[in-house]
Amino acid sequence: MQKRRKNRLLLFKNGEVKMRKVIKIFIIFTIGFNCIACNPKHNDYSISVIDTSSTTNKSQITFYDNNLIKKSIYKYNYAELGTHSYQPQYKNSNIYLVPRGIGNKHDEKKIISINKKTRQVHEIYVNKNNIQCVSVSKRYLYTSSNLNMISYLTQYDMKNKKYHDLSLNDQYLSLVFSTNKYVYCFVNSLNKEFIYSTLQIYDHNLQPIKNIDITTIGNCQRKYTIYKNKAYIPVSYDMNDQNISKLIILNLKTNIIENIISFENTSYIGEIVKYKKYLLISHTNEVSLNKAKFTIFNLNNNKFKTINSNICIKSMAIKNNSLYTVDSLNYIYKFDLLNDMKLVKKIKHTPPKNMYLSTIAS
């Protein structure tokens, strides 16, 4: 058990042993791309499916319309673009993704934003290896990265084109998200007996505001959603590294954890998406599909209903009144949210040779 905990927490040791000294500035520039069957109208697609490679700088994004008919394909020169472990981030008409880079190097050192109207890409250079996730608020962009037992919270001021770093020694920064007032960091560290977990809250000067011990709640937070000044964060493992299925409800005005919801007899939470006053939750089980479940959670009263799904959901996205999901076999499903989640259509998506499907976005 101890070895498994240590292996999972030490994943962020990937990358170069010694980082080159690089001038710590952010550079934004436009990158060219190739398009097959282009039709760059913003309203011609419902979801985008991202395929990528771990061994070469190749990725492609396939755009499907609301009937799951392929509209266009755009190719980009990135390795490990996107992941189903973290959600794509959205701001205005842009999707923000992490291209981690080839193999164990993970040295791409950048965030990309893709304009949903033009499909053009802008790169935001970040002087860090092994970037895990990105968060975007009104003015600031934040990334978490991990290297050689040190985690870094990196801030980019999109107005003044400046950056600020905060290092966390012997800690693993699993999730960062931000509002216009605060930055929220979920951090894990390993002691001799269990995984110690905290929620560290900072202002935008990266000055500490509050530190909440969440060890007894659990760890491995990777996703979140915000609804009416509250954040909803899934918890996948307990302090002893056992799978659990919990949901933290955090008040973003008071910075107090208001509630912890437990989902009994379910696998860990794989995906969450917000639809109107509901949170749609997939409980993933790659081993046994009959244990895969789906929860419809009412955000106004915390009541929920869990049903069997028989689909190992890998990624989810909402567009208009439809839910799109991708399973572990790369089948794309469209469900009608106005008709009791009726299955409307199912198609097979085939990634190019030597690529894999990393995630979907709306």
Regions found by a protein language model. Give the residues of each.
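An edge-strand/N-cap motif at the start of beta-rich repeat modules
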Residues: 38-76
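Post-signal peptide N-terminal segment of secreted/secretory-pathway proteins
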Residues: 68-136
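Residue position within the beta-strands of beta-propeller blades
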Residues: 49, 97-98, 143, 185, ...
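Blade-level signature of beta-propeller repeat domains, shared across WD40, Kelch, NHL, RCC1
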Residues: 328-333, 338-362
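Repeated scaffold domains used in trafficking and secretory/extracellular systems
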Residues: 80-91, 128-138, 170-180, 216-227, ...
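A short beta-strand motif characteristic of beta-propeller blades
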Residues: 69-79, 119-126, 161-168, 207-214, ...
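Structural motif
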Residues: 55-63, 104-112, 149-154, 192-200, ...
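Acidic, serine/threonine- and glycine-rich low-complexity intrinsically disordered segments
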Residues: 170-275, 279, 283-287
